[in-house]
C-alpha cells in the first residue's frame, strides 16, 4: 500500500465528532454510535536525534467510555508513503505512524503521529516565502526569464518553504514554479517534496513528487543556503531532459 504524503503533519483525522446518530433500517429508530477517539501519548509530533533510540509511546483509544486500545491497528509509512515495518533512526528522515480503529458499528477513524529523525547540529533555517530570481535561475542552461518569455509563459513565480523540524524542510515546488505558475497548468504539476539542511548550510534532496506525472526528480546537487543574503540555490534534473537550476530569494 502506498500513500502520497504531502506536508503530512496530520493530527487527528477522523474523531473530531465524539458521536453521531444513525437510523436503524428495520425500525426507523435513531440510536447513538460512538466513533473511536485517540489520545497520542507523547503528542502528534515526536522528534528523535539521528542515531538515537525510538520507543513507541503508545496511544489510548476510547469508544465512548470503553477503552479499546487493544483494538488499535498501527501502520508506519516512510517519507515516500511506503509501508515499513519499523522506525529506523540511522538517517535523517521522518515517518508517519497511523493509528486506526473500527467501532462496534463498523465505522473507522484514525489519528497520525509524525516522527522526525533530525540532526541536532543544524542551527540555521531556510523557511519562508521566496521569489524566483528569474534572471539567475536557468532552464536547460538558459535564463528562465528568456525561456518563459519565448514561450509566452508568465514571467514570475514564488516558492514557499516550511520548516518541519530542525534541518528538515518541505517545499511546494522544487521546479521553481515552471509548470504550475509560469506555464500555468495547475497545482498537480508542482514538484513538492522534502529536503534537509546540513550544518554547513548545504542541502540534500530527501523526497520529491509531482502528482500530474506521478514521478520525481532525478537529483539535486550543489544545493546551498546563504543565510546572509537569504538565497537558496541548487541544480536539479528531471526526466533525464529537464534541468532547472533555481535561485530563490527570501522575501
Which residues are covered by each model-predicted region?
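Ser/Thr/Gly/Pro-rich, low-complexity flexible regions
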Residues: 121-251
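Bacterial Sec-dependent N-terminal signal peptides
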Residues: 4-11, 15-44, 122, 251
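Short, exposed coil/turn segments at beta-strand boundaries within extracellular/luminal domains
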Residues: 104-111, 240-242
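N-terminal helix-cap/turn-to-beta initiation motif at the start of protein domains
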Residues: 88-92, 114-131
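Well-ordered beta-strand positions in beta-sheet-rich domains
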Residues: 26, 45, 110-114, 156-158, ...
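Solvent-exposed, low-complexity, repeat-rich "mucin-like" stalks and linkers
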Residues: 34-67, 155-157, 165
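Serine/threonine-rich, repeat-prone extracellular segments and beta-strand-based repeat modules
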Residues: 66-108, 117-118
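Residue-level recognition of well-ordered beta-strand positions that form the cores
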Residues: 60, 98-102, 114-116, 131, ...
Amino acid at each position: 500500500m502506498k500513500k502520497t504524503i504531502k506536508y503530512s503533519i496530520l493530527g487527528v483525522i477522523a474523531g473530531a465528532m465524539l458521536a453521531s446518530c444513525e437510523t436503524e433500517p428495520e425500525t426507523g429508530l435513531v440510536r447513538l454510535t460512538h466513533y473511536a477517539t485517540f489520545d497520542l501519548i507523547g503528542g502528534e509530533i515526536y522528534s528523535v536525534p539521528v542515531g538515537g533510540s525510538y520507543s513507541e509511546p503508545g496511544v489510548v483509544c476510547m469508544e465512548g467510555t470503553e477503552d479499546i486500545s487493544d483494538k488499535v491497528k498501527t501502520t508506519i509509512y516512510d517519507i515516500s508513503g511506503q509501508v515499513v515495518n519499523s522506525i529506523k533512526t540511522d538517517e535523517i528522515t521522518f515517518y508517519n505512524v497511523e493509528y486506526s480503529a473500527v467501532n462496534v458499528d463498523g465505522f473507522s477513524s484514525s489519528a497520525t503521529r509524525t516522527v522526525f529523525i533530525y540532526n541536532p547540529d543544524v542551527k540555521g533555517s531556510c523557511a519562508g516565502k521566496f521569489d524566483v530570481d528569474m534572471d539567475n535561475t536557468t532552464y536547460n542552461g538558459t535564463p528562465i526569464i528568456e525561456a518563459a518569455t519565448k514561450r509566452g509563459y508568465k514571467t514570475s513565480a514564488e516558492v514557499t518553504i516550511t520548516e518541519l523540524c530542525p534541518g528538515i524542510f518541505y517545499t511546494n515546488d522544487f521546479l521553481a514554479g515552471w509548470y504550475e505558475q509560469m506555464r500555468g497548468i495547475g497545482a498537480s504539476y508542482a514538484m513538492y517534496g522534502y529536503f534537509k539542511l546540513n550544518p554547513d548550510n548545504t542541502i540534500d534532496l530527501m523526497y520529491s513528487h509531482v502528482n500530474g506525472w506521478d514521478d520525481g526528480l532525478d537529483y539535486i546537487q550543489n544545493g546551498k543556503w546563504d543565510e546572509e543574503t537569504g538565497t537558496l540555490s541548487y541544480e536539479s534534473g528531471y526526466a533525464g531532459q529537464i534541468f532547472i537550476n533555481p535561485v530563490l530569494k527570501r522575501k
